[in-house]
Amino acid sequence: MELLEERIKKDGVVLPGNVLKVNSFLNHQIDPQLMMTLGQEFARLFKDAGVTRVLTAEASGIAPGIMAAYCLGVPMVFARKKKPSTVTDAVYTAEVFSYTKQVTNTISVEAKFLDANDRILVIDDFLANGEAAKGLISLAEQAGAEVVGVGVVVEKAFQGGHDWLVNHGYHLEALASIKEFADGQVIFN
């Protein structure tokens, strides 16, 4: 998606450790117009998948996830990283390692928000090694739901997440696919 690639070139910062900082428009400050455009693109890409619910992870997946859900006309649920004291019902849980933060989180969704009849579209901000996507897929599978697609705003194709998802048969769409970082610059596929 050219608009997104241009925004990454303009405002993204490559940090040590193959980390791309895009906090000025995606995962700290949010550009709502850009998020709506991303949501429209996800809706276009998955329009024939029969999506009944979007599933994402807090916090950075929420903005693109809600816009995709809005454009598809379906609800969105986000996996929490900490179980609130108000949650007393059954939950689905999965362990997720964060490449950027180098920590493992237990993500959870209340069981009443996912069911076996759901056709889930997983949306997330980044795909690196695929840990968040795998965790979200696990939550959907625990509910007996079918994952009909995975949409990511930015993928680092040089890490293993892309290959894992494709090799396991998931329909993956990345709005910006990074081939590599070279001399502080982003090189797109």
From Swiss-Prot:
Protein origin, superkingdom: Bacteria
Disulfide cysteine pairs (residue numbers): none
UniProt GO molecular function: xanthine phosphoribosyltransferase activity
Keywords of the record: Cytoplasm, Glycosyltransferase, Purine salvage, Transferase
Subcellular location: Cytoplasm
A Gene Ontology biological process term: XMP salvage
Listed pathway(s): Purine metabolism; XMP biosynthesis via salvage pathway; XMP from xanthine: step 1/1
Signal peptide: none
Reactions catalysed: XMP + diphosphate = xanthine + 5-phospho-alpha-D-ribose 1-diphosphate
InterPro entries in UniProt: PRibTrfase_dom, PRTase-like, Pur/Pyrimidine_PRTase, Xanthine_PRibTrfase
Binding site for 5-phospho-alpha-D-ribose 1-diphosphate: 128-132
Keyword Cytoplasm tagged: yes
Any one Gene Ontology cellular component term annotated for this protein: cytoplasm
NCBIfam families registered for this protein in UniProt: PRK09219.1 (NF006671), XPRTase (TIGR01744)
Role, per record: Converts the preformed base xanthine, a product of nucleic acid breakdown, to xanthosine 5'-monophosphate (XMP), so it can be reused for RNA or DNA synthesis.
Assembly description: Homodimer.
Family recorded in the similarity comment: Belongs to the purine/pyrimidine phosphoribosyltransferase family. Xpt subfamily.
Protein name: Xanthine phosphoribosyltransferase
